[in-house]
């Protein structure tokens, strides 16, 4: 998803989206890495039944006049970074000199590119060891921060392609089980629409 944003023909446009940062920090370097791997695009596979991921890549590249040799194989990419948690979407990896890395994502909305809020949040994760941690209580029928159902909270908490999700706004997320003590690093505890009462032991926690 979002693959057009990083295509060689669109690279200048892509870089211009970050001019407000590179103008004042010209030492910022952008490296583009092209790869192919398993896609979440079911329509892509339905239109190319019987073809492997590599064969689909070759077919699409030839149609667009792109060099098929510029794409890393899945195993080659994994030697650099594992993007399986990102569903192999186009993503930026911000990296400091000390090797610390953070993802800066594209989003499934009309703007697509990260805005100032998302860029600032990503940069803060690079330099700040004390990010705010939001804990979500588990059990007791509470709304689930990992599921995407009508009563659950995945989209606003940790849906990676949703711009306003907490993980894209500089927050760390942690599930909390009151059978154990609440971790000290949790700054905010969310108890979302609890259906059953807490036990005396959990109340103590």
Cite the ranges covered by each PLM segment:
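Short, surface-exposed patches at the edges or C-terminal ends of soluble domains, predominantly
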Residues: 1-205
């Amino acid at each position: 998803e979002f693959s057009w944003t990083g295509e060689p023909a669109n690279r200048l446009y892509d870089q211009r989206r970050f001019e407000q940062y590179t103008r004042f920090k010209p030492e910022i370097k952008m490296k583009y890495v092209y790869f192919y791997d398993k896609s979440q695009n079911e329509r892509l596979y339905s239109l190319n039944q019987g073809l492997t991921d590599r064969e689909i890549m070759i077919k699409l590249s030839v149609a667009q006049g792109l060099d098929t040799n510029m794409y890393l194989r899945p195993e080659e990419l994994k030697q650099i970074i594992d993007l399986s948690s990102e569903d192999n979407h186009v993503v930026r990896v911000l990296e400091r000199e000390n090797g610390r890395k953070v993802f800066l994502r594209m989003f499934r909305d009309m703007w697509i590119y990260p805005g100032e809020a998302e860029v600032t949040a990503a940069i803060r994760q690079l330099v700040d060891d004390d990010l705010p941690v939001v804990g979500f209580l588990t059990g007791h029928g509470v709304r689930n921060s990992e599921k995407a159902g009508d009563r659950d909270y995945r989209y606003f908490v940790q849906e990676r392609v949703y711009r306003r999700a907490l993980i894209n706004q500089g927050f760390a997320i942690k599930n909390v089980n009151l059978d154990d003590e609440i971790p000290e690093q949790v700054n905010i505890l969310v108890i979302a629409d609890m259906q059953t009462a807490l036990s005396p032991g959990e109340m103590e926690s």
